[in-house]
Amino acid sequence: MTSPAPEPVSIDSVALAQALIRRPSVTPADEGAMDVLQRQLEALGFNCRRMKFGEIENLYARRGTERPNLCFAGHTDVVPVGDSAAWTQGPFEAEIQDGMLYGRGAVDMKSAIAAFVAAVSNLPRDLPGSLSFLITGDEEGVAEDGTVRVVQALAAEGEVIDHCIVGEPTSANLLGDMVKIGRRGSINAWIAVDGRQGHVAYPQRAANPIPVMVDILSRLQSRVLDEGYEGFQPSNLEVTTIDVGNTATNVIPASAKARINIRFNPAHQGKDLRAWIEQECRDAADGFSGRVEALCKIGGEAFLTQPGAFTDVIVAAVGDATGRVPELSTTGGTSDARFIRSLCPVVEFGLVGATMHAVDERVPVQEIRDLANIYQALIGRYFAAFA
C-alpha cells in the first residue's frame, strides 16, 4: 500500500522574512535563525543537515535524489545595526510600515531566503530533479567557517550541484534590472615597516620607517593594473589605512603600517598580485636597516559564469514576472558565489540593494512577493530546460 501524498504546505514569504529578521543573528551569532529556516524546509520535505564548523552554523538541505540539482545559496547572518536609536523601527522587530518591511537583514538577505522557500512551497514536489539550499551563518564576517567549508565538505562527499542561485541583493534600481554573473577577485595586504625610534634632530641615530612606506605605496599605486577585461571593470588598488601611531612632533616613529585592497578582474590571479606586492616591498626596503613585511590574503579569485542556457532561464523568469530584461553584470563587491563557483555555474539574483547595511534597512513588502514569483518561474523554467 502506497503512502498518501503529503499535504501541500504553502509558506508566506513575508511572514517567513519577519520570523527570520526577528532572530538577531549579527555575525557570527545565529540566535535560532537556522532553526526557523530548518523547520520550514522540513515541512516541505527537505532532508536537512546542520554542518557546524567552529562556532558557525551552516545548513545544507536537499529534496530529491536525481539530477539536475538546483541549489539556492544565501546567509542568515547580518551586519551590526550601528546606532539602534537612529532607527525609526526596531532593527529586529520586523515591523511593516507604509508597505515597507523594516529590519536588519530585510534586504541582505533574509527576505530572499524567505522568497525562495515560498516559491518552492508553491510548486509540486515531484519535480524532475532535486532542489537544495546551502545557507551559512558566516558571510558577513570572516567567511572562513561558512560556505567555503560546506563546499569543501560536499565536494569531498561527491555531492553534485548542477547550478546555483545566490540570493544577494543584485538589483540596482528596480527588481529584476540586474543579475550578477561574475565578480572581481579580492586581495588584502597588511604592510608593516619596522624602523628605529629616535629624535628628529638626530636622524642618524634612528631608522625612519615612513619614507620606506611612502615608497612602497607609491610603487604599488603607480602601476596601472589593466584597462579592463571583457565584461569586467578595470582592476583597482586602494590604500585603506596608514598608521604610525605617533602624536609627537619631535620623534621619528618606530614603525609604520598600511593596508591595501585590490579588486581584480580575470586579467590577474591572486598569487601573481601577491608576488608583485611582496617584490615591491623588498625593492623599497633595499638599503633600509629595519624590517619590512607584507602579509597578503586572497579573498577570492575573479570568475565569470558565461551567458548561456542557465542565464537564459533567469532572464526569462524575470521577464515573466516583471517584463524587464536584466543586465548581466560583474560589478560590485565579493560574495559567497566565489566559493560556489568551484562546484558549479553560479549566478546571483535578488532584491534591490539600496538600503542594505544601512540604518532603517527596508524592502517593499510587494517586492518580496514579486521576488518569490520570479523564483517560482525560474525553478519551473530551469527543470524544463535541464531535466
UniProtKB/Swiss-Prot annotation:
Annotated residues for binding of Zn(2+) 1: 75, 108, 168
Q: Listed GO molecular functions?
A: acetylornithine deacetylase activity; cobalt ion binding; succinyl-diaminopimelate desuccinylase activity; zinc ion binding
Q: Which Gene Ontology BP annotations are present?
A: diaminopimelate biosynthetic process; L-arginine biosynthetic process; lysine biosynthetic process via diaminopimelate
Q: How is the cofactor bound?
A: Binds 2 Zn(2+) or Co(2+) ions per subunit.
Q: Which reaction does it catalyse?
A: N-succinyl-(2S,6S)-2,6-diaminopimelate + H2O = (2S,6S)-2,6-diaminopimelate + succinate
In the Enzyme Commission scheme, what number(s) does this protein have? 3.5.1.18
Which residues hold Zn(2+) 2? 108, 140, 357
Q: Where is the active site?
A: 77, 139
User: According to its UniProt record, what is one Pfam family this protein matches?
Assistant: Peptidase_M20
Pathway field of the UniProt record reads: Amino-acid biosynthesis; L-lysine biosynthesis via DAP pathway; LL-2,6-diaminopimelate from (S)-tetrahydrodipicolinate (succinylase route): step 3/3
Class of enzymatic activity (EC top level): hydrolase
Q: Which cofactor does it need?
A: Zn(2+); Co(2+)
> Which UniProt keywords are given for this protein, alphabetically ordered?
Amino-acid biosynthesis, Cobalt, Diaminopimelate biosynthesis, Hydrolase, Lysine biosynthesis, Metal-binding, Zinc
Summarize the subunit comment. Homodimer.
Q: What does this protein do?
A: Catalyzes the hydrolysis of N-succinyl-L,L-diaminopimelic acid (SDAP), forming succinate and LL-2,6-diaminopimelate (DAP), an intermediate involved in the bacterial biosynthesis of lysine and meso-diaminopimelic acid, an essential component of bacterial cell walls.
Family under the similarity heading: Belongs to the peptidase M20A family. DapE subfamily.
The record's NCBIfam families line, in alphabetical order, gives: dapE_proteo, PRK13009.1
> What is the protein's name according to its record?
Succinyl-diaminopimelate desuccinylase
Recorded source organism is: Caulobacter sp. (strain K31)
